[in-house]
From Swiss-Prot:
This is Small ribosomal subunit protein eS4. CDD domains: KOW_RPS4, S4. InterPro entries: KOW, Rib_uL2_dom2, Ribosomal_eS4, Ribosomal_eS4_C, Ribosomal_eS4_central_region, Ribosomal_eS4_central_sf, Ribosomal_eS4_KOW, Ribosomal_eS4_N. The keyword Cytoplasm does not apply. Residues 42-104 form the S4 RNA-binding domain. The keyword Iron does not apply. The gene is RPS4. It comes from Gallus gallus (Chicken). Transmembrane segments: none annotated. Keywords: Ribonucleoprotein, Ribosomal protein, RNA-binding, rRNA-binding. Gene3D superfamilies: 2.30.30.30, 2.40.50.740, RNA-binding S4 domain (3.10.290.10). GO terms for cellular component: cytosolic small ribosomal subunit.
Length: 263
């Protein structure tokens, strides 16, 4: 009988958005336990080796991490399988680069470079609000931060802006129609649009309708919605494509146009 946590992850069973080819080995790096779920995170090793190509092997990644060059959300991380996830800020002091993990329209984590100014904060979705011992109000975010004494106006599903240096809330956005949001799960993963309305289904899942910048409408569950801006002004810089998913025909035309202009 197996006791304790699993220590391995087969390459075939690894999340598809890591984009690992299945023939180069048997195993994939199993993310450590941490603030993001296994299937919704990107281990540091994959980010450094497979995305940025700063290392060729896992050993090289370990050497980079052990020199304490890599910071995630302002904290040095030396664990190569540390699970970085949505909205995390990865900073490499040595090269002066900062990245924010956000989804592209295909539902993968894009290598999205940001300025040093933007790397000072992150947005977090409020998962839970409760009153702890001695009546102290607490707030829990999507990346497992617990913040005491939050603003009483902040409710579940709102988004808060956190200063990474202090861990304090600097601002917040209400979950409301007319606000800009990103979809963080389901078939519409990575799409960005404005919330048009919310259908309440007591005892089931609330459905939120979203309209993107091209006028396409789609719906998803409330749990997959992450508010990223007031009105249609995003509080973070957006990756290429601005979260608008193209149809297959549009993608083909775009590719052909790019080919002709370069050829």
């Amino acid at each position: 009988m197996a006791r304790g946590p699993k220590k391995h992850l087969k390459r075939v069973a690894a999340p598809k958005h890591w984009m690992l080819d299945k023939l180069t080995g048997v195993f994939a790096p199993r993310p450590s336990t941490g603030p993001h779920k296994l299937r919704e995170c990107l281990p540091l090793i994959i980010f450094l080796r497979n995305r940025l190509k700063y290392a060729l092997t896992g050993d090289e990644v370990k050497k980079i991490c052990m020199q304490r060059f890599i910071k995630i959300d302002g904290k040095v991380r030396t664990d190569i399988t540390y699970p970085a996830g949505f909205m995390d800020v990865i900073s490499i002091e040595k090269t002066g680069e900062h990245f924010r993990l956000v989804y592209d329209t295909k539902g993968r984590f894009a290598v999205h470079r940001i300025t040093a100014e933007e790397a000072k904060y992150k947005l977090c979705k409020v998962r839970k609000i409760f009153v702890g011992t001695k009546g102290i109000p607490h707030l829990v975010t999507h990346d497992a931060r617990t913040i005491r004494y939050p603003d009483p106006l902040i409710k579940v599903n709102d988004t808060i802006q956190i200063d990474l240096e202090t861990g304090k809330i600097t601002d917040f956005i209400k979950f409301d129609t007319g606000n800009l949001c990103m979809v963080t799960g389901g078939a519409n993963l990575g799409r960005i649009g404005v919330i048009t309305n919310r259908e309440r289904h007591p005892g089931s899942f609330d459905v939120v309708h979203v309209k993107d910048a091209n006028g396409n409408s789609f719906a998803t569950r409330l749990s997959n919605i992450f508010v990223i801006g007031k009105g249609n002004k995003p509080w973070i810089s957006l990756p290429r494509g601005k979260g608008i998913r193209l149809t297959i025909a549009e993608e083909r035309d775009k590719r052909l146009a790019a080919k002709q202009s370069s050829g």
